[in-house]
Amino acid sequence: MKVKARFGIIVTTLLLGTTACLNGCATMGMGKTEATKTTAKVETAETGLKQTLAQVDATQASLNSLIEPSQADVKNKFEAYSADVEKTEKMAKQLEKDQAKMQEQQREYLAEWEKKERTYTDPSLREASGQRRAALNSAYSEVPKASTQFQDALNGYLSQVKQIQTQLSLDLTNKGIESITPAAQKALSDGGRLKDTAEPVITAMERVMSEMAREGSGAAAGGQ
């Protein structure tokens, strides 16, 4: 009888352990999935930002070429400039959407993390999880802060180059180009400073991805 009782206890323990493992694995799997999705959104936004900066460089080059004095082939240069302006505007809008999606995913990720955290009965585990979540939340909060200045600078630049495009569409003569040259020079100067305002955004995004990678993404969102 004692043997049977002991055997029953062992079987019960094994079953309970298996159930706990399955539940833990399911939680970990979901944590990894959400962490991967969150990191991917940040990577997409960062890539879009860098591509937008590269497109600004192209717009800068075409504008600089367009305002050269006594040049030939003005029409083709204006068309190239117009195409660059439109492409820059399109990429800026997409970047804004990507950043909004990134922030939405981050909010959902942290909310899910906190929800799982409340189920922990081990105080030390709850504390460790809370510290990791707070570190990520701190990193996340820096991105929109840094993005505001860059977005304002980018929108201001776009407004300038679009107005130059509109004016030249009305008057593409040498005199017309000469008249917008001061505004063009200002746009070129402002565009040249965009990378400076973008640097803190890139740094903030890199910090987020670094925090996500620290100790493995499986440790995030209640993964351990």
What are these regions (language model features)?
Residues 42-56, 85-88, 92-106, 143, ...:
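Long amphipathic alpha-helices with heptad-repeat character
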Residues 19-24:
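C-terminal motif of bacterial Sec signal peptides marking the signal peptidase cleavage site
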Residues 98, 102-182, 199, 214-215:
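Extended amphipathic alpha-helical interaction segments
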Residues 26-90:
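Immediate post-signal-peptide N-terminus of mature secreted/exported proteins
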Residues 15-16:
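Core hydrophobic alpha-helical transmembrane segments of single-pass membrane proteins
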